[in-house]
Amino acid sequence: GHGEDALSESFTAALEKEGVAQESLNLTTVSQIPEDAGCLFFNVPVSDLSEGEAAVLTSYLEQGGRMVLISGITSAQMPNLDRVLSAYGVAAAQGMIVESDSNGAIPSYPNFLLPQIRSHAITDPFLQENGLLLLPNAHAIVHLDEVRSTVSIEDLLVTSEASYLKTDTSTLSYQEGDLTGPLSVGVAITEDTAQ
């Protein structure tokens, strides 16, 4: 509904192997997320949610719903999606991350990141397989200063201290003012709704 990329056949097959059923859901046509929805998955949206969609999504999350958001570099303004994310203490820092640590990127491609994978219930199966994760042309996820005490944010994927965020990509060299690493490129956010 927002120009998302289609899920790859291999990803869809992996979901099916794990017994996960998937179906599309148009948030503009529902007043609430179906109760049997275990998780909403947004795959690189290129346009914003409407205010109504953001309200439906927020209500779902406030009731303990789950969401996976894979986002990409975009010039599109997304104030409604940004509002949902900021309610959970994060924001997308637009720009492209450049990694100058040779262990953190593909050789000769400093924008093709090989982030450090931190131990977490989400990432541990991947770590046990000694997996590598390639993130081409990634942006950073910043932790906001103000977040509810019930919200916990854990970094899952981070770049090295030698990385930096380029908002002006006319040069990939570091320039004064570039946000420096380590930078988050994957986070897990949970909220204790029992409080």
Residue ranges and their predicted role:
Residues 4-195:
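Acidic, S/T/G-rich, low-cysteine, solvent-exposed domains in lumenal/extracellular/periplasmic regions
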Residues 1:
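An acidic-aromatic substrate-binding cleft motif
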